[in-house]
Amino acid sequence: MAAPEEHDSPTEASQPIVEEEETKTFKDLGVTDVLCEACDQLGWTKPTKIQIEAIPLALQGRDIIGLAETGSGKTGAFALPILNALLETPQRLFALVLTPTRELAFQISEQFEALGSSIGVQSAVIVGGIDSMSQSLALAKKPHIIIATPGRLIDHLENTKGFNLRALKYLVMDEADRILNMDFETEVDKILKVIPRDRKTFLFSATMTKKVQKLQRAALKNPVKCAVSSKYQTVEKLQQYYIFIPSKFKDTYLVYILNELAGNSFMIFCSTCNNTQRTALLLRNLGFTAIPLHGQMSQSKRLGSLNKFKAKARSILLATDVASRGLDIPHVDVVVNFDIPTHSKDYIHRVGRTARAGRSGKAITFVTQYDVELFQRIEHLIGKKLPGFPTQDDEVMMLTERVAEAQRFARMELREHGEKKKRSREDAGDNDDTEGAIGVRNKVAGGKMKKRKGR
């Protein structure tokens, strides 16, 4: 990281936040009227805890360290002060937001443009997986806000003629702990060297790791720390369970759970791209409306999957940890940890996809004979023993034959998909990578399994 600029330690504005948010409005926080109206139009009826803490300090011109759990309203906490300042001193290339993933970058851009639609705010998303030339043209138009992943931004700073950030007024690092965990330290260091020192900096992170502390010392001046949650915890309205399963029956138990909790929306987390794709195909072959989201899909397909799930055109989203943090996915009823996370902290972020904004939700973790130690670490981290989810094992076993048949077709589809990729066939529109399972699915007798009467 860049050498520290002898900045002071963060001021502690991080006492447990007082429960006064019901009396606060965005106007009370100092947000200008036109942006308050935009908040109303987005359905933001009152500010969240992190917004109550961070916005007034940011409007005073302070650097901010925001420690907040997923789904806490972090984007509004930095977007509103930036737009407020932009109204006072209009300027192109006004703010840069660094984010670890492409999907999160697009979501942040959507929120900036929605909040700033009435004042003509323009943003550009600069991420990998998208044509560099079109991004260069977008940068040439000098948008007000740039939302970028560090690697692609460095590419443009080094190679796009005429592009620089020498007049930048605001830097935001969102999901800073994840940016650093993804080995973007070198890129962040380069960015810090080419932007003005006389700027405002907001650093938002779910956790205060040693790397984040080092980044704070290098990048922020006399920051104020706003902490919503200072320890690892899950929300009270989240019902958490586990199921102890022989490894070879994981697919069968998953189908059982989906039938038992039919009518809910599900996010199912898998550890690898391949297993995400395979499981999505398996479920599609059984008639479930499942869709995958993982890093080996093209950017358009990833966004397509996300949008179909958000629009409720699909009720089951299977994902790698790319979707466990940051993404704005409302109304997830059940999270299933099909593959247990190898890092205990990832459990918090995964199950944080449900029971958001005061709603209730369920999280079910599959534990095989190989996962016991990992599961015990999770229980130690959250400070509680999880109850078992009730299952009827005889009913589960009745599903094995049909699930085995669907597994066979899923493997077949996966092989065909791999061969198509090798032949470099044209992208099939906005179809997700499991659409091809439709023909195969009809070969699996009976389609989606119905619950037996009397249950």
Swiss-Prot record:
GO terms under cellular component: membrane; nucleolus; nucleoplasm; nucleus
SMART domains, A to Z: DEXDc, HELICc
Role played: Required for efficient ribosome biogenesis. May have a role in mRNA splicing. Involved in apoptosis.
Tissue expr: Expressed in skin, lung and breast. Also expressed in the brain.
Species in which this protein is naturally found: Homo sapiens (Human)
Catalytic activity: ATP + H2O = ADP + phosphate + H(+)
Gene3D superfamilies linked: P-loop containing nucleotide triphosphate hydrolases
Motif (Q motif): 24-52
Gene name of the record: DDX47
Keywords of this entry: Acetylation, Apoptosis, ATP-binding, Helicase, Hydrolase, mRNA processing, mRNA splicing, Nucleotide-binding, Nucleus, Phosphoprotein, RNA-binding, rRNA processing
Pfam families, per the entry: DEAD, Helicase_C
Cell compartments where the protein resides: Nucleus, Nucleolus
Name of the featured protein: Probable ATP-dependent RNA helicase DDX47
One BP term from GO: extrinsic apoptotic signaling pathway via death domain receptors
Chief localization: nucleus
